[in-house]
Amino acid sequence: ALWKNMLKGIGKLAGKAALGAVKKLVGAES
């Protein structure tokens, strides 16, 4: 079950990074 928690953590970090990238792109366009 420990690897599942690790995957969840990685998923959260990846999600935050993706959101940050999208916000940067939107901010650069506007």
From Swiss-Prot:
Disulfide links within the chain: none
Keyword Secreted attributed: yes
Signal peptide span: none
Record keywords: Amphibian defense peptide, Antibiotic, Antimicrobial, Fungicide, Secreted
Tissue: Expressed by the skin glands.
Family note: Belongs to the frog skin active peptide (FSAP) family. Dermaseptin subfamily.
Protein name: Dermaseptin-S3
